[in-house]
């Protein structure tokens, strides 16, 4: 049996795919090469500022993802199972942080929770606490831009669960909470876990909203992406530091992507 030779169209498509893949590969390869080639970049990896920014990123993203799961899960289930007044408006509001530029999200948060904001001014008058430019502001910004990704994935997971299974369990005497915990969540675990990983990845890479709402204060609000900007713009670490910080972010992103793939495979199994 003779093998068919690839057609001209197939070769052209393969060439375009190769060029497209190299377009994404070379920037990351260049980053790794620069980090390995420049001893200053390797030295910057041991700088205390890098560890501080990494710790702040991990702590704030852990809190923001927890908040996203805590509040986003019931919202996603509500949107998947119920027709509520204003549901379309809520649905659109959840899409806005995804499609808006992060800087616009930061300005919106500032006008709402800033010292002269819609809610920020009365809160400060009552409590004396100002939210902007604090670590809590970092968490708020991350949650604002990342939580909708989790809600979208969770909603899709809940919609894929057959409502008849929940109804049968209810007729057998199970409470709504028991049905949700023992039937709905396990059946939707794949999308729920994938959404949580996506939420974490988005929160980890958040820059614009955090910069405007929380600032870029070393040791207080400076997460890894903000530390990259500070180093690139002439900070103490300089360009080698920006390369080193970018490499750390790249490594964390790869771990997240591998986790997402594993979760997706287990969810489909």
Where are these regions (language model features)?
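Membrane-interfacial helix termini and adjacent extracytoplasmic/periplasmic loops
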Residues: 2-3, 39, 87, 106-143, ...
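Transmembrane-helix boundary motif in ABC transporter permease subunits
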Residues: 4, 43, 63-94, 107, ...
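Transmembrane alpha-helices
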Residues: 15-16, 21, 66, 96, ...
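Periplasmic/extracellular loop-to-transmembrane helix junction in inner-membrane transport proteins
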Residues: 2-11, 29-66, 78-87, 230-240
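Non-cytoplasmic
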Residues: 27, 191-230
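Hydrophobic alpha-helical transmembrane segments of multipass integral membrane proteins
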Residues: 22, 55, 59-71, 75, ...
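C-terminal transmembrane helix and the adjacent membrane-cytosol boundary/short C-terminal tail
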Residues: 2-13, 23-27, 86, 152-166, ...
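Interhelical loop and adjacent transmembrane-helix boundary motif
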Residues: 4-10, 41-42, 48, 211-255, ...
């Amino acid at each position: 049996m003779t093998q068919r030779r690839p057609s001209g169209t197939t070769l052209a498509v393969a060439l375009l795919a190769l060029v497209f893949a190299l377009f994404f590969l070379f920037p990351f390869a260049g980053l790794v090469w620069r980090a390995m080639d420049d001893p200053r970049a390797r030295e910057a990896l041991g700088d205390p500022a890098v560890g501080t920014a990494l710790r702040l990123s991990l702590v704030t993203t852990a809190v923001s993802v927890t908040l996203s799961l805590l509040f986003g899960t019931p919202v996603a289930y509500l949107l998947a199972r119920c027709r509520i007044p204003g549901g379309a408006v809520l649905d659109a509001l959840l899409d806005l942080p995804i499609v808006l530029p992060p800087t616009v999200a930061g300005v919106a948060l500032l006008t709402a929770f800033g010292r002269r904001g819609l809610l920020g001014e009365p809160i400060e008058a009552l409590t004396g606490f100002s939210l902007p430019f604090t670590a809590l502001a970092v968490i708020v910004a991350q949650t604002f831009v990342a939580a909708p990704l989790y809600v979208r994935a969770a909603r899709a997971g809940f919609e894929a669960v057959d409502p008849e299974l929940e109804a049968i369990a209810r007729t057998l005497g199970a409470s709504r909470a028991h049905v949700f915990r023992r039937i709905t969540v396990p059946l939707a675990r794949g999308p729920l876990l994938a959404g949580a990983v996506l939420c974490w990845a988005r929160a980890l890479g958040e820059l614009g909203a955090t910069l405007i709402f929380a600032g870029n204060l070393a040791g207080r609000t400076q997460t890894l992406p903000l530390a990259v900007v500070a180093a690139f713009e002439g900070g103490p670490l300089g360009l080698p530091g920006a390369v080193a910080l970018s490499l750390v972010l790249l490594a964390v992103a790869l771990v997240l992507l591998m986790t997402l793939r594993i979760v997706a495979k287990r969810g489909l199994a």
